[in-house]
């Protein structure tokens, strides 16, 4: 190459036999995708109705709150962990008396 710019005459291509281990992969192989009907349908997750009884979250309130939920086994366990952890439910009377940031 002479000069700062490359010209077509300066490019020399050497074509040699390609080694078998570096052959390109044929992306259009004989593989076929299954039809939607052939794919397995996900089984319906079993949901069970639960009645949850939890105390009001205010310190001086004796009210027991009843909540009815329809949940999976995993969902009801997660809800149980929330209720025994950081989440506290309030009764309607205590909701008006407690200070809260939400509406």
From Swiss-Prot:
Motif residue range(s): Nuclear export signal: 76-84
Localization, UniProt: Host cytoplasm; Host nucleus
Keywords of the record: Activator, DNA-binding, Early protein, G1/S host cell cycle checkpoint dysregulation by virus, Host cytoplasm, Host nucleus, Host-virus interaction, Inhibition of host innate immune response by virus, Inhibition of host interferon signaling pathway by virus, Interferon antiviral system evasion, Metal-binding, Modulation of host cell cycle by virus, Oncogene, Transcription, Transcription regulation, Viral immunoevasion, Zinc, Zinc-finger
Disulfide bonding pattern of the chain: none
Record Pfam families: E7 (PF00527)
Organism annotation: Human papillomavirus type 5b
Organism taxonomic ancestry: Viruses, Monodnaviria, Shotokuvirae, Cossaviricota, Papovaviricetes
UniProt comment concerning the protein's domains: The E7 terminal domain is an intrinsically disordered domain, whose flexibility and conformational transitions confer target adaptability to the oncoprotein. It allows adaptation to a variety of protein targets and exposes the PEST degradation sequence that regulates its turnover in the cell.
Domain of life: Viruses
GO cellular component: host cell cytoplasm; host cell nucleus
Free-text function comment from the UniProt entry: Plays a role in viral genome replication by driving entry of quiescent cells into the cell cycle. Stimulation of progression from G1 to S phase allows the virus to efficiently use the cellular DNA replicating machinery to achieve viral genome replication. E7 protein has both transforming and trans-activating activities. Induces the disassembly of the E2F1 transcription factor from RB1, with subsequent transcriptional activation of E2F1-regulated S-phase genes. Interferes with host histone deacetylation mediated by HDAC1 and HDAC2, leading to transcription activation.
Gene name as annotated: E7
PTM annotation, UniProt: Highly phosphorylated.
Gene3D superfamilies in alphabetical order: 3.30.160.330
InterPro entries with a match to the protein in the record: Papilloma_E7 (IPR000148)
Motif LXCXE motif in this chain: 27-31
GO terms classed as biological process: DNA-templated transcription; symbiont-mediated perturbation of host cell cycle G1/S transition checkpoint; symbiont-mediated suppression of host innate immune response; symbiont-mediated suppression of host type I interferon-mediated signaling pathway
Name of the protein in its database record: Protein E7
